[in-house]
């Protein structure tokens, strides 16, 4: 019983890690959303501006 619960939890953690990695990879190709780190290489999306002080995307 304990082993099956452990395997279930580890499976959920693995699934979460894989989905997070995929999401980060997809977003790396796109523009920066709200509160994302921005730079010359990764500009903010059209509706956001890059904060000069904090270097993240925010509302204008």
Curated annotation (Swiss-Prot):
Specify the domain of life of the species encoding this protein: Eukaryota
Q: What does the similarity note say?
A: Belongs to the neurotoxin 10 (Hwtx-1) family. 63 (VsTx1) subfamily.
Q: Which residues form the signal peptide?
A: 1-21
Keyword set for this entry? Disulfide bond, Ion channel impairing toxin, Knottin, Neurotoxin, Potassium channel impairing toxin, Secreted, Signal, Toxin, Voltage-gated potassium channel impairing toxin, Voltage-gated sodium channel impairing toxin
Q: Which cysteines share a disulfide bond?
A: 31-45, 38-50, 44-57
Q: In which tissues is it expressed?
A: Expressed by the venom gland.
One term under GO cellular component? extracellular region
Q: Describe its function.
A: Inhibits sodium channels Nav1.7/SCN9A and potassium channels Kv11.1/KCNH2. Also binds the voltage-sensor domain of the potassium channel KvAP (from the archaeon Aeropyrum pernix) with very slow apparent binding kinetics and affects channel gating. Reaches its target by dynamically partitioning into anionic or zwitterionic headgroup lipid membranes. May bind to the open state of KvAP.
InterPro entries this protein is in? Answer: Huwentoxin-1, Huwentoxin_CS1
Q: Does the keyword Amino-acid biosynthesis apply?
A: no
The record comments on the domains as follows: The presence of a 'disulfide through disulfide knot' structurally defines this protein as a knottin.
Chief site of localization:
secreted
Propeptide stretches are 22-29
Q: What GO terms are given for molecular function? A: ion channel inhibitor activity; potassium channel regulator activity; sodium channel regulator activity; toxin activity
The identity of this protein, by name, is U1-theraphotoxin-Agm3a
What compartments host this protein? Answer: Secreted
Q: Which organism is it from?
A: Acanthoscurria gomesiana (Tarantula spider)
